[in-house]
Amino acid sequence: MLACLQRTQNPPGQHLACPSKSLDLRKCESVASSMHSSRYPSPAELDAYAEKVANSPLSIKIFPTNIRVPQHKHLSRTVNGYDTSGQRYSPYPQHTAGYQGLLAIVKAAVSSSAHAPAGHPKSVLKSVEGKRTKLSPATVQVGIAPYPVPSTLGPLAYPKPPEAPAPPPSLPAAATATSVIPLPGRGLPLPPSNLPSIHSILYQLNQQCQAPGAAPSACQGVAVPHPSPAKHGPVPSFPNLAYSATAGLPDCRKGTELSQGATPALTLAGATKPAGYAEGGLDYLLWPQKPPPPPPQPLRAYSSSTVAGKSQSPEICGGRAFERANGSPHNCGMGLPGSFTVGQYFAAPWNSVLVTPTSDCYNPAAAAVVTELAPGAARELAGPPGDVLSGLTSKSVCNTAVLSSSLQSLEYLINDIRPPCIKEQMLGKGYETVAVPRLLDHQHAHIRLPVYR
């Protein structure tokens, strides 16, 4: 059918090309051959042209007008006779469909900086259509090398938190600092703390007390019954004591005491003191003088003592300075209604080791101390052992008692770094017990940190 149509269409052209029969037949044949030569190049011709142009990508071939070169609209038009000009037949994205062409043209799409003279390289890429396309340096680098940019290789480097500064070597091995961290909110995470770990403190205490050549003075005075230095000024009888507080506290608790055991071995590291501390003592400079209004409900407080007892009513905190045996702030609620009991919140005895006159670590000087808190109310506290390494027969029991007393005094010190009544006035609703994981095989400490609610 097509052949018939072609035959019917061709003779008028031949007749127009040869209008007069007087012309030579050869001229008519040449005209007819030139008409048939306007065709698409064969695949063999395209391959030969591609091989010839591959060595010189920037060469320009000017074809005669009677030879039609396939353009972009003619490429990839049909596959096995089916029209694939639509986008749904193309396996490539829309922006890459226009860059499919002959092999020679695809190879010509390289950076012209490779053939440019030595000097400043040009980041110019010639596309299939012959247009110059400027590329970004990252694209040029990725295009030249098949590897990604070196800055993207390797794992991401996250900023490391600042490491805790090492305590000075002149201080004793066990150094503690304030663990009272006011939180801005319940849901916010804690900032990275530079405080020494409780594990490292206990480990150093254990190593210092269990060393075969350890000095007796290193472990003897871990807890000595003595009035607090917060009331009596610097104590000259404790040369190792780096925590001598002489600053005046607010009127609610002028004579706020430390525990019954002032701890010469537990020192306050200078690197971890708050901004309000001075070298001569504790200066509470940054704390507000006017407390916020107290909450109407009764206050739940947690005591740091190791024996159960009934707390005093909040009315005894009316500005009188008296000495108390433990660092618990449960009797400093300024004008809170009613009395409350804290017996169910008392922690278990430290390691459940009780110092009795029949034990190996008994010291008559560290007998039970009875301290008068108010008329008619007395609290009996078992004093921690004072001289625990003199004349030992069973060393393991004594080391256990030393660690127990040191942990107890450590908790007292943490509770008494800030005035308790200021803590309750600032924080309002009490304390939250934070259970530290099991420190040693025979220890389990509960450090109480005040938090906002």
Curated annotation (Swiss-Prot):
Coiled coil: none annotated. Transmembrane segments: none annotated. Disulfide bonds: none annotated. InterPro entries: FAM222. Belongs to the FAM222 family. This is Protein FAM222A. It comes from Mus musculus (Mouse).
